[in-house]
Amino acid sequence: MEEILRNARKERTGKVVSNKMNKSITVAVERKVKHAKYGKFIHKTTKLMAHDENQECGIGDTVRVMETRPLSKLKRWRLVEVIEKAK
């Protein structure tokens, strides 16, 4: 029998920009994209809503999130770990 790999899901690392919701956080994930014409690398930011079951995150924390089933209208990610707490 084949085993279903749970680790085949996407993982992203980013900073928490909002934790005002109940058991939810907003994570800003930054990536570099090369400009098509000029070749300069541009920083693009994607904001993800993630599920924080224990409400352990604060604004400015660096966190790792993993893709999961839809939990609400906008939440499709869940908190895996807090990499670094904000100072």
UniProtKB/Swiss-Prot annotation:
Disulfide bond positions: none
Instruction: State if Zinc is listed as a keyword.
Output: no
Q: Which cellular component terms (GO) are annotated to the entry?
A: cytosolic small ribosomal subunit
What's a Pfam family this protein contains?
Ribosomal_S17
Q: Name one GO biological process term.
A: translation
Please provide the record's keywords in A-Z order.
Ribonucleoprotein, Ribosomal protein, RNA-binding, rRNA-binding
The record's listing under Gene3D superfamilies reads: Nucleic acid-binding proteins (2.40.50.140)
Question: What PROSITE patterns does the record point to?
Answer: RIBOSOMAL_S17
Example GO molecular function: rRNA binding
What domain of life does the native source organism fall in? Bacteria
> SUPFAM superfamilies, from UniProt?
Nucleic acid-binding proteins
Extract the CDD domains matched here.
Ribosomal_uS17 (cd00364)
PANTHER family recorded: 40S RIBOSOMAL PROTEIN S11 FAMILY MEMBER, SMALL RIBOSOMAL SUBUNIT PROTEIN US17M
Query: NCBIfam families, per this entry?
Result: PRK05610.1, uS17_bact
What does this chain do?
One of the primary rRNA binding proteins, it binds specifically to the 5'-end of 16S ribosomal RNA.
The UniProt subunit note reads as follows: Part of the 30S ribosomal subunit.
Which protein family is named in the record? Belongs to the universal ribosomal protein uS17 family.
Instruction: State the protein's name.
Output: Small ribosomal subunit protein uS17
Source organism (scientific name): Cytophaga hutchinsonii (strain ATCC 33406 / DSM 1761 / CIP 103989 / NBRC 15051 / NCIMB 9469 / D465)
